[in-house]
Amino acid sequence: MILQNRTFDLNPNDIAGLELVCQTLRNRILEVVSANGGHLSSSLGAVELIVGMHALFDCQKNPFIFDTSHQAYAHKLLTGRFESFSTLRQFKGLSGFTKPSESAYDYFIAGHSSTSVSIGVGVAKAFCLKQALGMPIALLGDGSISAGIFYEALNELGDRKYPMIMILNDNEMSISTPIGALSKALSQLMKGPFYQSFRSKVKKILSTLPESVNYLASRFEESFKLITPGVFFEELGINYIGPINGHDLSAIIETLKLAKELKEPVLIHAQTLKGKGYKIAEGRYEKWHGVGPFDLDTGLSKKSKSAILSPTEAYSNTLLELAKKDEKIVGVTAAMPSGTGLDKLIDAYPLRFFDVAIAEQHALTSSSAMAKEGFKPFVSIYSTFLQRAYDSIVHDACISSLPIKLAIDRAGIVGEDGETHQGLLDVSYLRSIPNMVIFAPRDNETLKNAVRFANEHDSSPCAFRYPRGSFVLKEGVFEPSGFVLGQSELLKKEGEILLIGYGNGVGRAHLVQLALKEKNIECALLDLRFLKPLDPNLSAIVAPYQKLYVFSDNYKLGGVASAILEFLSEQNILKPVKSFEIIDEFIMHGNTALVEKSLGLDTESLTDAILKDLGQER
């Protein structure tokens, strides 16, 4: 447990004192996020809600569960991390999300959306079985109500009536504008006036009526429900209170007191302003959701924009270019149009763009149906979020061999977001699925060719991956070439050992190749390109070389080296193969270069490892 290193007086009866605490927390959040980067606007918008929670509840007896948890900065500051908050998202510093190994006050790991109510239901069930005092309190926000798991949890909660408080932090935005009929309908319902006290008075009056008019009274009550903003939740058996002003501490405190006394499932609807307290961010939701270091006075980024396109930009530009000529191309994303680059397709062809909200499983299944109808759906998705849709990939796309195209962004180590966001699993779980074609580009130019190949491939689902930020391999080092199904590319033939790169691993292998050349060791270099199917000529390609070294940004177990070893084994070829992939553990947050160095994946460490394997000193 991290001990308290700054004392806050959170007296629920001293609203003025709580407001001063809120200002102190906002100032600290702005100070640190402007220096380190992080999730700014969500955390600023949730300050009063979190202060109210801490003022009334002991979070070790009443677990606080933060949905996604990127809005939990105020919680960290209130639980012994005020001074250490300066290390936010830094290597070996504080995580940007709740993390139980960091603090006993962080109840559950989080990073992906919409899990909080499900976790809360599990806690409530356990508390009932243990006859424990207290109840879980979930803070939801940023579009979590668009995901299926939220409604799955509500379904059980409303039926079982477990004591639980849910606070819906409604800032009318997820990461970008919320999508879907449910979000829109709930948003409209929730913009009405505060009905709770009026409804209580109506119920009181109805209870005094004689039994002879009970039927009419009950009909009036049912009719009244239809005009209240909480009808959706109350029909599920969940008490609804709100809307309230999520920045009014008096309203927050009184509402939490009421919810606490009910000892039933309660949803408090709180309306907040994303970016509250920082005028530059207020009203500019998507730009200020997740930010890099910026100047606090001007709001301008401290990092100049690179002249080199990011992989995401290279992908989206190519897709837009193809979409102009091919009306069958459609773009699909799960609440990440800007992050995946599909915002360009929205502007150019709005009818051919589909943001399905935070519903990855639906994204994959509906795309499979579009593919069956002759369209070419490019599902643009982060590697970490694709894992939420695994069954849809298997059941709905691959069994029927429907030609969806998975454009897997943020593949590999992603840096400051850490364990919950690393893109390290897709290689292992996708290559185990029949009918799936898997390939990876080595730089922006071959990424463009990968998009073109995917567009033409119509016999099965296919997937290609690319990193966040930039490729390791610089532009123009090797001539770009088109993709041919199952064909690798030998970039350098001469040498006694062979370095095999897959995707971004080609750039890493090339840097090692140059470092070894300075030691008078010549290495051949192979761009594997296709992981599935592997090049049928691979056994002949590797035959001249004494040892093989494999480089790729994914987990080692079930990874690229495993695929190569399986292939060679089936050919009865015994060849030493050493893997430089990711070890079998969840990788922490931090600057990507520092994280890679800690894993021995920087050029110097890789070169030393090969020299040692060859029996030579550096």
From Swiss-Prot:
One of its GO terms (molecular function) is 1-deoxy-D-xylulose-5-phosphate synthase activity. Mg(2+) binds at residues 142, 171. InterPro entries: Dxylulose-5-P_synthase, THDP-binding, Transketo_C/PFOR_II, Transketolase-like_Pyr-bd, Transketolase_BS, Transketolase_C, Transketolase_CS. Signal peptide: none annotated. Binds 1 Mg(2+) ion per subunit. Binds 1 thiamine pyrophosphate per subunit. One of its GO terms (biological process) is terpenoid biosynthetic process. Its cofactor is Mg(2+); thiamine diphosphate. It catalyses: D-glyceraldehyde 3-phosphate + pyruvate + H(+) = 1-deoxy-D-xylulose 5-phosphate + CO2. CDD domains: TPP_DXS, TPP_PYR_DXS_TK_like. It is an enzyme of class 2 (transferase). Pathway: Metabolic intermediate biosynthesis; 1-deoxy-D-xylulose 5-phosphate biosynthesis; 1-deoxy-D-xylulose 5-phosphate from D-glyceraldehyde 3-phosphate and pyruvate: step 1/1. It holds the Pfam family Transket_pyr. Thiamine diphosphate binds at residues 70, 111-113, 143-144, 171, 278, 360. HAMAP family: DXP_synth (MF_00315). Belongs to the transketolase family. DXPS subfamily. Homodimer. This is 1-deoxy-D-xylulose-5-phosphate synthase. It comes from Helicobacter pylori (strain G27).
